[in-house]
């Protein structure tokens, strides 16, 4: 099989290209050479968390790999099979568990059987969706396509110390994924706020939550459900310190849109809650079915689905357009239409390939 050449500097030119390329290579068993890896970043080349994704997928697929080292600008990845089973994955310090999961999930869905993985690393870290978003928003939305996966957060890990622990269960998909046809959201059913802090006074999580609630309740009349997660000092198993908030809205016809914000040193807890609430309001004002982060995460699955998917996203991002470009490289037969401008709401139509191993 000829090697698929992928320029890692296309689109947003970051780690996302590598993650999606690895995921689709492992899934289709098409060998790839990715060059110019993270060429547009200040510290180009493979970083430790990208290396973990490579190592994990090497293990799952029995791949032959060349140049897999920190700082490498080019990598060769030749997968041979898709295994399932139990895995232990240590990403190291606060490397993002969510981003490694992004690379793993498509492969595990089409593996030989069901899979279980135990991942150590960062659950709530900068420049990455929090594990709460993956659990409550992403997995919920793609369940409409036939994906069955579950996440258990055993322990949180924040930057820079990490130490998070997450258990993941993935059910094998027996048939091709179903297409997704949801352009606009319907009536709002309610809001849910998840606010947490570790190795910090409990009032931090409470203040984050109250700030978000105050803003949302001033605009919306729908029910707001709160979940505040704190730990007494003598029973806090985390390395910490850290805090964060996820807010998501349940809307018809059975979708979720989310937003989040991370605490950091010197940032008032009230601002953490306020940031997440204001972002979610922006998402909802567009009337589209999916938030800006969900948009690019959905793209690989829309390429795999059997039939035509049509989704509305609150913002067409460079990440979304990059995900489409990577998808086209693996599935040139798929038809794609983007209706909208960069930075604006838009509609994505993809005629999927009905992928089955």
Curated annotation (Swiss-Prot):
GO cellular component, one term: cytoplasm
Reactions this protein catalyses: a 3'-end 3'-phospho-ribonucleotide-RNA + ATP = a 3'-end 2',3'-cyclophospho-ribonucleotide-RNA + AMP + diphosphate
PROSITE patterns referenced in this protein's UniProt entry, alphabetically: RTC (PS01287)
Main enzyme class: ligase
Location within or outside the cell: Cytoplasm
The keyword ATP-binding belongs to this UniProt entry's keyword annotation: yes
Secretion signal span: none
GO molecular function term, any single one: ATP binding
A single GO BP: RNA processing
Keywords, in A-Z order: ATP-binding, Cytoplasm, Ligase, Nucleotide-binding
Pfam (any one): RTC_insert
InterPro entries: RNA3'-term_phos_cycl_insert, RNA3'_phos_cyclase_dom, RNA3'_phos_cyclase_dom_sf, RNA3'_term_phos_cyc, RNA3'_term_phos_cyc_type_1, RNA3'_term_phos_cycl-like_CS, RNA3'P_cycl/enolpyr_Trfase_a/b, RPTC_insert
Chain sites annotated for binding ATP: 102, 293-296
Function noted in UniProt: Catalyzes the conversion of 3'-phosphate to a 2',3'-cyclic phosphodiester at the end of RNA. The mechanism of action of the enzyme occurs in 3 steps: (A) adenylation of the enzyme by ATP; (B) transfer of adenylate to an RNA-N3'P to produce RNA-N3'PP5'A; (C) and attack of the adjacent 2'-hydroxyl on the 3'-phosphorus in the diester linkage to produce the cyclic end product. The biological role of this enzyme is unknown but it is likely to function in some aspects of cellular RNA processing.
Family to which the UniProt record says this protein belongs: Belongs to the RNA 3'-terminal cyclase family. Type 1 subfamily.
Name listed for the protein in its UniProt record: RNA 3'-terminal phosphate cyclase
Organism, scientific name: Desulfurococcus amylolyticus (strain DSM 18924 / JCM 16383 / VKM B-2413 / 1221n) (Desulfurococcus kamchatkensis)
